[in-house]
Amino acid sequence: MKKVIPLFIIAAGLVIAGYGGFKLIDTNTKTEQTLKEAKLAAKKPQEASGTKNSTDQAKNKASFKPETGQASGILEIPKINAELPIVEGTDADDLEKGVGHYKDSYYPDENGQIVLSGHRDTVFRRTGELEKGDQLRLLLSYGEFTYEIVKTKIVDKDDTSIITLQHEKEELILTTCYPFSYVGNAPKRYIIYGKRVT
């Protein structure tokens, strides 16, 4: 009996580690597939006209209505060499595919709060390296938009004051769980605020 218990513990550990590895590989595969879809979605304005004139951008903006779970664009973070797909929605299935766009928040040129969320152990695992002044870029079918990080903040996971859905000024907000190395459901949230520069 004494030999069976250690073997059972080792087997259970291997099963848990194997499942964790499978989930990580599965999520990375979904993210890569969604990035391909997002690249196609973000190319549409250039392919349609060969240029980025304001009339074409307005037409593309008017038809820009991503459905839940659909790739809507790309988030580029030059400092950490990241190119991440943006998916409409923040449910668990959506976040497995990439960075989730909070459904009730806005998109660029809508003069409101743009909220993007991602997992700290997948798409946003290196966001802790970002600093004030670093750039974030959104590539959508109707244009490219650059934001500069103006501040970061750590809040309690139950703090609902971050997502205000204000409609007074355009701001980009990235949210992820914190601490980054925490195992399990993290008690805090890491928030990055960006202001539009182009």
UniProtKB/Swiss-Prot annotation:
Residues 48-57 have a biased composition (Polar residues). The active site is at residues 119, 177. Its main location: membrane. Coiled coil: none annotated. It holds the Pfam family Sortase. Gene3D superfamilies: Sortase (2.40.260.10). It is found in: Cell membrane. The record marks 189 as: Transition state stabilizer. Its EC number is 3.4.22.-. Disruption phenotype: Mutant releases elevated levels of the sortase substrate YfkN into the culture medium upon phosphate starvation. Inactivation of the gene abolishes the cell wall anchoring of a fusion protein composed of a beta-lactamase reporter and the C-terminal region of the sortase substrate YhcR. Residues 36-46 have a biased composition (Basic and acidic residues). It is an enzyme of class 3 (hydrolase). Keywords: Cell membrane, Hydrolase, Membrane, Protease, Thiol protease, Transmembrane, Transmembrane helix. GO terms for molecular function: cysteine-type peptidase activity. GO terms for biological process: proteolysis. Residues 36-67 are annotated as: Disordered. Induction: Preferentially expressed in the late stationary phase. The chain crosses the membrane at residues 7-25. Belongs to the bacterial sortase family. Class D subfamily. Transpeptidase that anchors surface proteins to the cell wall. Recognizes and modifies its substrate by proteolytic cleavage of a C-terminal sorting signal. Following cleavage, a covalent intermediate is formed via a thioester bond between the sortase and its substrate, which is then transferred and covalently attached to the cell wall. This sortase recognizes a Leu-Pro-Asp-Thr-Ser/Ala (LPDTS/A) motif. It has two substrates, YhcR and YfkN. This is Sortase D. It comes from Bacillus subtilis (strain 168). The gene is srtD.
